[in-house]
């Protein structure tokens, strides 16, 4: 198993990539799920949520010097819980719709579980 710093950087990189794509090409986010972002307001909303939150997670996950152990642990647990919550909500939504495709819903749920696991392991060992 990679060390806590590696896990943090890996998860931070994934969240930074998600945020960057949403910031630069917000129409791509709903397109993955068969939707559109046809208005400036919808694209702004996508940037706020699908870029802003992942970028905040990436910053929180980056192992920066000067943060105390409690602060680091708290940030890791918050990102872990948010990632797990997204996976649970995604799977609950699929159950409510009685439809779970491997892509994109299953793929994103698996990614969120993996990110939650990485943050959990980093918090335990770091």
Task: Write out the residue ranges for each language-model feature.
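Short amphipathic, positively biased membrane-proximal segments
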Residues: 1-126
């Amino acid at each position: 198993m990679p060390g806590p710093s590696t896990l943090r950087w890996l998860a931070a990189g994934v969240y930074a990539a998600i945020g960057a794509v949403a910031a630069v090409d917000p129409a791509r986010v709903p397109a993955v799920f068969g939707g559109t972002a046809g208005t400036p307001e919808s694209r702004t909303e996508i940037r706020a949520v699908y870029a802003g939150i992942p970028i905040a997670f990436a910053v929180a996950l980056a192992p920066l010097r000067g943060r105390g152990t409690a602060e680091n642990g708290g940030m890791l647990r918050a990102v872990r819980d948010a990632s797990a919550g997204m996976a649970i909500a995604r799977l609950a939504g699929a159950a409510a719709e009685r439809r779970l495709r491997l892509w994109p819903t299953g793929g994103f749920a698996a990614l969120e579980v993996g990110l939650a696991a990485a943050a959990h392991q980093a918090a335990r060992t770091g």
